């Protein structure tokens, strides 16, 4: 039995410890900043709320043995909502008395446009993170397939949560859903990138995203009911909407960060396989790259603020 060569040992050590290097952390922050991570998360959260809440209402209207009142009560029971939070959920999902709950062709078409818009926002995330050419509407077929996968994953997720967990902390169900979540995330990136990301490069995103989102969802089960009830008690349905968008924003920050980290993990593993050694001034280079991205974002923000001020000053005249 031959001993492992020094090169093999070095490669193993680098594979296991690269994420501890400051340069890798700086590269990840630069990638997150390059895709405008927080702005992207806000856009995704808004798109998700615009698309998914109407989709839930539509499903309660067309699926047999499911109505909006039952769906609202299920959410209330699942998260232990009381008081203003419970009333806000009922007002948000349940139709008013005497209201026709039928689904029109125009309404269904508008809903599909909203869901497609959300899927394209996710598509732009993967295109920018992995530096791919933007396809926009040319990837519509894959977007539609992904929407079907999203509905299926949501149904499976809801079913597992319903039969496994009874309290607010859904630790067991989130652990059981890890394989399904990883598979869905890999499928999401593969479809929305028009299958341009190699499957091997999707593994870090699928695994990391599934783990981080499971941690977030477990914590959300604790703080979300308090946030929801507090906002709804103060501001009614508007407060419930703000709470939902806040929760979705945090969810999307985790998703965007997972994509940025996973992309850098894939690149780093590729460099290790090729035997490339990090340069001596790697930390300085990555720090300068991060500062350049921050300066660019600050300059863009200042230009937007100056344009806003000039517009209002001309309007006042």
Which role fits each region the language model picked out?
Residues 1-317:
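Membrane-embedded alpha-helices and immediately adjacent juxtamembrane helical segments
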């Amino acid at each position: 039995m031959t001993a492992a060569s020094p090169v093999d040992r070095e490669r193993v050590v680098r594979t296991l410890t690269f994420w501890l290097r400051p340069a890798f952390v700086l590269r990840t922050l630069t990638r997150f900043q390059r895709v405008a991570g927080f702005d992207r998360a806000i856009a995704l959260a808004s798109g998700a709320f615009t698309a998914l809440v109407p989709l839930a209402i539509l499903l309660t209207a067309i699926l047999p043995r499911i109505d909006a009142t039952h769906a609202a009560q299920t959410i209330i029971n699942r998260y232990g909502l009381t008081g203003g939070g419970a009333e806000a959920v009922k007002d948000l999902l349940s139709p008013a008395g005497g209201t026709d709950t039928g689904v029109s062709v125009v309404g269904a078409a508008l809903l599909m446009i909203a869901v497609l818009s959300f899927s394209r926002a996710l598509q732009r995330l993967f295109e920018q993170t992995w530096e791919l050419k933007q396809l926009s509407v040319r990837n519509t077929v894959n977007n539609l397939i992904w929407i079907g996968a999203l509905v299926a994953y949501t149904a499976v997720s809801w079913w597992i949560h319903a039969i496994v967990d009874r309290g607010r902390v859904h630790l067991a169900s989130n652990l059981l859903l890890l394989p399904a979540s990883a598979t869905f995330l890999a499928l999401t990136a593969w479809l929305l990138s028009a299958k341009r990301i190699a499957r091997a490069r999707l593994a870090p995103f699928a695994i990391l995203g599934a783990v981080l989102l499971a941690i977030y969802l477990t914590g959300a089960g604790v703080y979300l009911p308090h946030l929801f009830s507090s906002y709804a008690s103060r501001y009614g349905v508007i407060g419930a909407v703000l709470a939902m968008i806040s929760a979705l924003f945090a969810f999307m920050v985790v998703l965007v960060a997972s994509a940025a980290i996973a992309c850098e993990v894939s690149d780093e593993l590729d460099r290790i396989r090729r035997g490339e050694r990090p340069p001596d001034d790697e930390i300085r280079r990555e720090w300068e790259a991060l500062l350049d991205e921050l300066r660019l974002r600050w300059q863009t923000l200042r230009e937007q603020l100056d344009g806003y001020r000039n517009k209002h000053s001309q309007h006042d005249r």
